[in-house]
């Protein structure tokens, strides 16, 4: 049967979701299935690039998008002359060198509640509130799968369209 999914948040093109929460309506009959059977059924119906890690029962009317209390995004940036080998489609590549300490210091200015209108797609902010609360914004050096990256982790209650991408790119 066709089911309408509600995702906790959207991802920009080229961005991968890790721990994306999704809500969907289920019938009483489906609720009677044990969790393992329902999980196996859902896994069988999803494309190979989607992994379902667990199922959670929620109250009727729950929306993964509107009832979420926080969201977290991680952007990986590879810097230097060589393009990342294994993560070329999971990281931004910047040919220059990045001053991670300066980036981290600048990031602290964006923590807290601010009007982020300048950090979103202009048309998406028309007649809409643009104040958001960023609970943390950290810039760190990380190594994953043998490659070095600068990771930008942003946590907040909600984000405007392209807000996180613009913060990271600025």
Question: Language-model segments: what does each one mean?
Answer:
Residues 1-170:
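Structured-RNA-binding interfaces characteristic of tRNA pseudouridine synthases
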């Amino acid at each position: 049967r066709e089911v309408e999914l509600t995702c906790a948040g959207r991802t920009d093109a080229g961005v991968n979701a890790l721990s994306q929460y999704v809500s969907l309506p289920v019938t009483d009959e489906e609720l009677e299935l044990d969790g393992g059977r329902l999980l196996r059924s859902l896994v069988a119906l999803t494309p190979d690039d989607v992994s379902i890690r667990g199922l959670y029962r929620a109250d009727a009317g729950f929306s993964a998008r509107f009832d979420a209390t926080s969201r977290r995004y991680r952007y990986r940036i590879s810097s230097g002359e060589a393009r990342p080998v294994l993560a070329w489609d999971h990281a931004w590549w910047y040919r220059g060198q990045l001053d991670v300490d300066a980036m981290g210091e600048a990031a602290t200015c964006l923590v807290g509640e601010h009007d982020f209108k300048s950090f979103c797609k202009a048309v998406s902010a028309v007649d809409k509130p643009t104040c958001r609360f960023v609970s943390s914004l950290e810039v760190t050096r990380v190594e994953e799968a043998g490659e070095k990256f600068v990771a930008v982790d942003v946590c907040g209650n909600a984000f405007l369209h392209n807000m996180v991408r613009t913060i990271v790119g600025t």
